């Protein structure tokens, strides 16, 4: 990734001076909106539903006469009731699982330790199948870890990755279990120390874009732009790309102010495509994000967003950010929402965790067993989620723009959507056991098809003013039987 990282040409790194006078000191590689001026960084955070539930509970937790509420209060009450339903139902459900998950996590950790000693320090599920246990203890360890690999449907992943994934899931369920009883800690406020509710207080954070939780961003970045054809690790989707690193999402739900300012920062510093591999079910300061989306649209910047991993229909379940501009009831034209397609060899064309929606999801792209860069120095691993599908689309958008820079954001979106391939088959609907036409899961009804999208791009007359020379026209040798 090092060769493809964006570097701010107007900033001298580590000199303690805001050389480009944009308000962000030493933003050479980008900016961290989750940092404090003292160098500390926000690592984890709470769920937005929990934040809203506990903030509004003193006002709306008892008996409420809706007829006496103002319009603003009615909207607050609606949000509270929705958050209350999510938190109280989710908490009850999680509480029933936590004891079992804690026991299974402890058992899995012990099993992994046994296998590291008796088998080998690093192994994947396929390796483990070949292990010959010498006794019942070893056999139990093998059985426990194999169940975990198969449960995550990632037999190619390493043992350390699987244990880490399970730990993350277990801790998330613990948070949900306690959410109805305990008000969440203000992780962000204790470190960032801005006036959160003043949008003009925007020059906060620090330049430490790696911070303490770089796995997700590193994996996503590699999918888009890992250096190609160097014989090392993986090839990103696109050449001639620079990754501008902006940290605005913790291990937990992001805050709307950070997202809005991150979008504006990217636009102001020349980004043409913004990948957004994050999301949540509540957006109390949606207007700030909507304004940033409109700002990006006015500057010709394409936004690519992950649809989410709840196995839900987002036509009827809210998911943020989204292209729906609340105050004008219009839809942003520079916004693509991406669902995750699965591995046909192991399950189906739609990943079982992916959100979907005939109106709100635009296209599906690969999001299961995606191999990419991870922190650690030329280290690689698997991950899955719509967070992995979104950068596949962002990478294709970057590829198209690198050869056809005169195309507008809307034209690139058109190429991607028009080129999507409808498999004309029924698949298991995410989050269920019933089958439906794959075409019902998105606006295009299709899977991303790079070959077709690039062919369409070649036919369009661009609408964007070009300030630099385009890349040479591609002349790939395409095996049409394997296109897409």
Task: Go through each PLM region and give its residues.
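Structured segments of extracytoplasmic/periplasmic soluble domains
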Residues: 4, 8, 223-227, 249, ...
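Gly/Ser-rich catalytic serine loop of serine hydrolases
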Residues: 209-221, 308-310, 379-393
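Mature extracellular/periplasmic domains of secretome proteins
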Residues: 211-214, 235-238, 253-275, 285-305, ...
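Extracellular S/T/G-rich loop segment that most often corresponds to the catalytic His/Ser-adjacent loop
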Residues: 301, 323-402, 406, 447, ...
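Subtilisin-like serine protease catalytic core
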Residues: 1-255, 327-334, 356-360, 403-415
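A cross-family glycoside hydrolase active-site/sugar-binding cleft signature
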Residues: 247, 275-279, 306-307, 339, ...
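C-terminal subdomain of the subtilisin-like protease fold in secreted/lumenal serine endopeptidases
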Residues: 267-269, 273-276, 287, 333-337, ...
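Solvent-exposed loop/turn segments at secondary-structure junctions
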Residues: 38-39, 230, 249-253, 279-283, ...
């Amino acid at each position: 990734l090092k060769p493809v990282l964006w570097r701010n040409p107007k900033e001298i790194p580590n000199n303690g001076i805001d050389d480009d006078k944009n308000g962000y000191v030493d933003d050479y590689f980008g900016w961290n909106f989750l940092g404090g001026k003292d160098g500390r960084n926000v690592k984890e955070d709470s769920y937005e539903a929990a934040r809203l539930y506990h903030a509004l509970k003193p006002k709306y937790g008892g008996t409420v006469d809706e007829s006496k509420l103002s319009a603003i209060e009615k909207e607050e009450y609606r949000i509270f009731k929705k958050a209350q339903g999510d938190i109280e139902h989710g908490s009850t459900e999680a509480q029933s699982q936590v004891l079992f998950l804690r026991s299974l996590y402890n058992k899995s950790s012990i099993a992994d330790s046994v296998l590291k000693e008796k088998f080998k320090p690093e192994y994947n599920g396929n390796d483990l199948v070949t292990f010959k246990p010498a006794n019942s203890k070893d056999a139990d360890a093998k059985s426990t870890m194999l169940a975990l690999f198969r449960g995550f449907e990632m037999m190619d992943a390493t043992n350390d990755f699987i244990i880490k994934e399970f730990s993350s899931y277990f801790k998330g369920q613990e948070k949900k279990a306690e959410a109805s009883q305990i008000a969440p800690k203000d992780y962000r406020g204790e470190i960032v120390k801005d006036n959160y509710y003043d949008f003009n207080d925007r020059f906060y954070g620090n330049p430490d874009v790696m911070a303490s939780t770089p796995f997700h961003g590193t994996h996503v970045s590699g999918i888009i732009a890992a250096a190609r054809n160097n014989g090392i690790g993986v090839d990103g989707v696109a050449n001639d790309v620079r990754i501008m690193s902006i940290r605005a999402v913790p291990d937990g739900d992001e805050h709307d102010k950070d997202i809005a300012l991150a979008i504006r920062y990217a636009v102001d510093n020349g980004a043409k495509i913004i990948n957004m591999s994050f999301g949540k079910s509540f957006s109390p300061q949606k207007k700030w994000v909507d304004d940033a989306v409109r700002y990006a649209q006015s500057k010709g910047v394409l936004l690519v967003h992950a649809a989410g991993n709840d196995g839900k229909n987002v036509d009827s379940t809210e998911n943020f950010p989204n292209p729906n501009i609340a105050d004008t009831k219009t839809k942003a034209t520079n916004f693509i929402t991406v669902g995750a397609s699965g591995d046909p060899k192991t399950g189906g064309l739609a990943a079982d965790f992916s959100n979907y929606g005939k109106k709100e999801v635009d296209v599906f792209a690969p999001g299961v067993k995606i191999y990419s860069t991870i922190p650690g120095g030329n280290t690689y691993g698997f991950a899955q989620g719509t967070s992995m599908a979104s950068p596949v689309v962002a990478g294709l958008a970057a590829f198209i723009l690198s050869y056809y820079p005169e195309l507008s954001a809307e034209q690139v979106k058109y190429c991607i959507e028009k080129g999507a391939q409808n498999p004309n088959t029924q698949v298991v609907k995410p989050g269920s056991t019933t089958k439906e036409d794959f075409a019902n899961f998105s606006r295009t009804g299709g899977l991303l098809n790079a070959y077709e999208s690039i062919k369409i791009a070649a036919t369009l007359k661009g609408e964007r003013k070009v300030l630099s020379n385009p890349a040479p026209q591609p002349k790939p040798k395409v095996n049409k039987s394997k296109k897409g």
